[in-house]
Amino acid sequence: MKFGMGSAQACPCQVPRAASTTWVPCQICGPRERHGPRTPGGQLPGARRGPGPRRPAPLPARPPGALGSVLRPLRARPGCRPRRPHPAARCLPLRPHRPTRRHRRPGGFPLAWGSPQPAPRPAPGRSSALALAGGAAPGVARAQRPGGSGGRSHPGGPGSPRGGGTVGPGDRGPAAADGGRPQRTVRAAETRGAAAAPPLTLEGPVQSHHGTPALTQGPQSPRDGAQLGACTRPVDVRDSGGRPLPPPDTLASAGDFLCTM
């Protein structure tokens, strides 16, 4: 079959081949085809007339609206060289620029790099009541800091050789409301006061301090919420002296007054 130059078959992929060759769908005409049918408005901006390689239409440099920052990384970048990371990421400072401008309380230890570390925490096996109260064990001399009697060693703090003095009640927040003592000493004093208070008498079912259900109540019917393993024998609390029960693991080890269900 022969076609003239003014034929309606403009796309070369629509031209019928010879019967001996197999038809290969190389470029099928579609709505984004570069050399599609010559219909008004069918060509996209930047379309090519020849059968060259297909490339997408050029996008604007920055699409208007909020989606501009989202669509911009999706564009194909020219393959001249791989993009290097931001140069500011390789120029990070080795230390903070203004270590003394941190928002810190005057009584705290300095946060500048190279300052002495705070005192280590006491061992978990020993009692930390003496450490919290600020006292020393009997027979052990307490080490004096260079800032004076118990003062801070950094300049500007209370008790330091360069001054600093006492801090007003409005400068340190809730810690200065009690005469400037640190919060740890105040909490230790409150703990000692709570330990000296007489114990409360037990009324009603005994309940341990771990929030376990009452141990004197046996399991009722299944409708009343009986649980498997609940104790059916009453607990003998006459020798406890009205004090709260020990932890559940201690109670479970004593089999004389607790069931082993």
Swiss-Prot record:
Low complexity: bias regions: 40-50, 64-73, 124-146, 172-197
Membrane-spanning ranges: none
A GO biological process held by the record: apoptotic process
Pro residues composition-biased segments: 53-63
Signal sequence, renumbered to the chain: none
Upregulation: Up-regulated by TP53.
Compositional bias ranges of the Basic residues kind: 74-87, 95-106
GO molecular function, a single term: ATPase binding
Any single Gene Ontology cellular-component annotation: mitochondrion
Gly residues compositional bias, start-end: 147-171
Start and end residues of each stretch annotated as Disordered: 27-261
Domain notes: Contrary to isoforms 1 and 2, isoforms 3 and 4 do not contain any BH3 motif.
Name of this chain's protein: Bcl-2-binding component 3, isoforms 3/4
Organism for this UniProt entry: Homo sapiens (Human)
